[in-house]
Amino acid sequence: MSKKRLHEIAKEIGKSSKEVVERAKSLGLDVKSHASSVEEADANKIASSFSAGVTKNVQAGSAKDKQVAEQKAKAAKATTPQPAASKAAEKPAAATQEASQPVAVKPKSRNFKAEREARAKEQVARRQAGQNRSNDRKSDYRQLGRSQGQQTERAGHKSQNQQRDRRFDNRPSSGNNRNDGHRQAGNRDKNRSFNANSRQQDIGRQGQTQAGAPKIDFKARAAALKAEQNAEYARQRESRFREQEEAKRLEQQARQEAKAAALKAQTEDKKHREAPAKATEPAEPVASMAAAPVAKPVDKRRKKQNRPDKAHDRDHGLEDGQKKNKKSWNSQNQVRNQKNSNWNNNKKNKKGKHHKNSNTAPKPVTERKFHELPKEFEYSEGMTVAEIAKRIKREPAEIVKKLFMMGVMATQNQSLDGDTIELLMVDYGIEAKAKVEVDEADIERFFTDDNYLNPDNIVERAPVVTIMGHVDHGKTTLLDTLRNSRVATGEAGGITQHIGAYQIEEAGKKITFLDTPGHAAFTSMRARGASVTDITILIVAADDGVMPQTIEAINHSKAAGVPIIVAINKIDKPGANPERVISELAEHGIISTTWGGECEFVEISAKFNKNIDELLETVLLVAEVEELKADPTVRAIGTVIEARLDKGKGAVATLLVQQGTLHVQDPIVVGNTFGRVRAMTNDLGRRVKSAEPSTPVSITGLNETPMAGDHFAVYADEKAARAAGEERAKRALLKQRQNTQRVSLDNLFDTLKAGEIKTVNVIIKADVQGSVEALAASLLKIDVEGVRVNVVHSAVGAINESDVTLAEASNAVIIGFNVRPTPQARQQADADDVEIRLHSIIYKVIEEVEEAMKGKLDPEYQEKVLGEAIIRETFKVSKVGTIGGFMVVNGKVTRDSSVRVIRDSVVIFDGKLASLKHYKDDVKEIGNAQEGGLMIEGFNDIKVDDTIEAYVMEEIIRK
């Protein structure tokens, strides 16, 4: 069943919500307010209870309404100079009502909704009556041309006419006269007739009307209905007025009691402070103050409403509905004003002097609190006067005045420089200190700040060991042996392409290993590994000895200041000579402890797992000597070992935690990127929730791929991390723009010279960030005179369509290192004729790019003299030219060779041969000591004894 709210029921039956709520409670329904809902049956029950009560009240109140109407009529007949008589006439009525009810009836408000509905019904009835009259006129016009012989049919339609007459009973009597006139006109014009049946019915209806149908006095009926409505309205107004008066009386009574209690408390308080003789004086104001807010406002308003020359005279000519509406509006204002009567009294009292009866003492003036000046003031450049005043608890006007006395014109919103602030603080006697601004975007401060770590929480951490050495000396094989796996066979060409970070456990202690590439291209990666390591294991093959990358690794380790453990590998080979390795390393400052040095030497065989335990024991011994400590309680900081772009995970970074503990969901800034640690995996590929110091982990959740070697730091919240990351990215972009060189007078010639150098544009895409760096650095080091490499773009990830579009626009070659192009990118590259080179070994990339650079140069040619000939005779042929007969004196003369005409050791002409003949035959060449004839293109001034030198231009192959 549907439910209804009480205010909807009140709206339907024309009652107030309060009455409906009270009636529902009296019927036993569980309701709380007008917004409560009841069932349909309960709603009908409430409505029926009101309808039953209304009929009783209307019958009971009809006699009272008659008395009220008679009293109003008597008051209207009385003249205006007799107001006393009208008041005397009103008093008996009031007396009778007071006799029946305890509170005087004072109807001031009406049910406007019911009045509007009644007026709307009357208007609808009037419109219907007007339509009926217009229909009667139309039907009367149709009566033209009726004959008297049709009256016999009227009796047959008598019943129908009687039913129709009931709808037209309210027509005025003047309409009959008009109908008579029309009927006479119809007798004069009988020829214009149509629709005979309708005319007969209309004539029968008029005859019935003329027969004297009973007329209803609508005015009397409307007056009776209005009297009933007024009686109902009066009853409702009486009940509301009684409720309002009762509530008002209770409210005023409570207010008087509260004020009396307050005044009594004040009186008792004064009794303790004043003399005993004056203890009884405050008794009089209590009564006056208690009576004041009740008597005065009510009397004033009643006199104002009963003035006969104002509203009553102005509303005398208005209609009943308008007049009642205006009274109701005034009554609502009266109720509102009576509720706020005390507020008005207080307002009036505030305008003038204090009330005579009020004995409240004036409020004492609150004295401003005096604040001590601070001893120190930490300021920042650009502080305003208002900010300084707030900090030192002084008025801005006071500071402005002091500045004016110092000769500085300033307002409270004006910024001050540091010197002015210091002078102002000296005037106040405060020690001024400049605030040290902390750069939140600076990650390096976490690594250099000694106060970042808590000495009480320092614990021992695992050592970070970097394995370094020359290419194919067994670095990855050693690490593979330590991890008991076989990833070494997966390296392309036996070369480690990027850093691998792994952690093993030996004798209950953990050791973190970093595997670095040994190729010359990975210098930056070796330097990066040495910067984050604690111990360096230098792998040297016993059969190869010290190699260039071995020396480089030694230099990196010395620069980082880390201890070096030398592992002489491949001692199982027949040509192994460990003593030669020890002596070669001694030449570079790596001296064994057996020779009195500081470096530990261990002879191992990574392939056959020989002396590996001894190597690990040496690592733990050196780590114990180094006393490696860390604080796991602080926010994590560390270094990026490697970074790559995964198709499904996005940016993936391999981090080495150096201090603190890294947790999942930590807000982090990595280099110029930022994000939140979404997932974290260890070296075994298992997900972990935290990473302690010296632990390598791979994380996801960064907005971009960071650079390998960047530092990272965990921030307090994501907002701070985002701000720091964006600021670092902005600074990096600004630095990159500043590195762009502009043409000036100083470097104009260098720029012009550089424009003559040819460039090979390349786009590098690799699997990890370290490989990208190594490739770019290696290609830039290629030295070919007149050609240089321009790296247009480098990034990690697969070759995509945007790379192909960029390569087409910049005429570049795409180099993919351990990556492949997407199908869409390959299709677009074929369509745009873009060259994509895919490689997995770095030195093959370098060789290929070097060949491309050499082919980019313009070919160089070298002149090669083929032979010489002397002109013995000339023949001039018309329309052909001059033919020179010659004899080859040295070498040969070929048909496609170029020739020089030399006369008296001076070159007269240099050009091509037009023809070469031996007797009458065209030949390709004429050898030594042979004769022949020739013609030269564009030259006919051949003379006897001229020397003809034949030569060709040969291309020089670049080395």
Curated annotation (Swiss-Prot):
Q: Where is this region: G4?
A: 569-572
Q: Where is this region: Disordered?
A: 33-373
What stretches pass through the bilayer? none
Q: Where is the tr-type G domain?
A: 460-629
Q: Where is this region: G2?
A: 494-498
Swiss-Prot/TrEMBL keywords: Cytoplasm, GTP-binding, Initiation factor, Nucleotide-binding, Protein biosynthesis
Q: Where is the composition biased (Basic residues)?
A: 347-357
Q: What is the lineage of its organism?
A: Bacteria, Bacillati, Bacillota, Bacilli, Lactobacillales
| PROSITE patterns in the cross-refs | G_TR_2 (PS51722), IF2 (PS01176)
Q: Is the Protein biosynthesis keyword given for this protein?
A: yes
Q: What is this protein called?
A: Translation initiation factor IF-2
From what superkingdom does this record's organism come?
A: Bacteria
Start and end residues of each stretch annotated as G1: 469-476
Binding residue positions for GTP:
469-476, 515-519, 569-572
One annotated GO molecular function is: translation initiation factor activity
Query: Where does this protein have compositionally biased stretches of type Low complexity?
Result: 76-100, 277-287, 328-346
Please give the coiled-coil regions recorded for this protein.
Answer: none
Q: Where does it live in the cell?
A: Cytoplasm
Compositional bias, Basic and acidic residues, is annotated for 63-73, 112-125, 134-143, 179-192, 234-258, 266-276, 306-323
Q: Which organism is it from?
A: Streptococcus equi subsp. zooepidemicus (strain H70)
* Pfam families to which the protein is assigned, alphabetical: EF-G_D2, GTP_EFTU, IF-2, IF2_N
Which residue windows does the record flag with biased composition (Polar residues)? 46-60, 193-211
Alphabetized HAMAP family for the sequence: IF_2_B (MF_00100_B)
> What does the function comment of this entry state?
One of the essential components for the initiation of protein synthesis. Protects formylmethionyl-tRNA from spontaneous hydrolysis and promotes its binding to the 30S ribosomal subunits. Also involved in the hydrolysis of GTP during the formation of the 70S ribosomal complex.
InterPro entries attached here? EF-G-like_DII, IF2_II, IF2_N, P-loop_NTPase, Small_GTP-bd, T_Tr_GTP-bd_dom, TF_IF2_bacterial-like, TIF_IF2
Sorted alphabetically, the Gene Ontology cellular component annotations on this record are:
cytosol
Region of interest called G3, as start-end residue ranges on this chain: 515-518
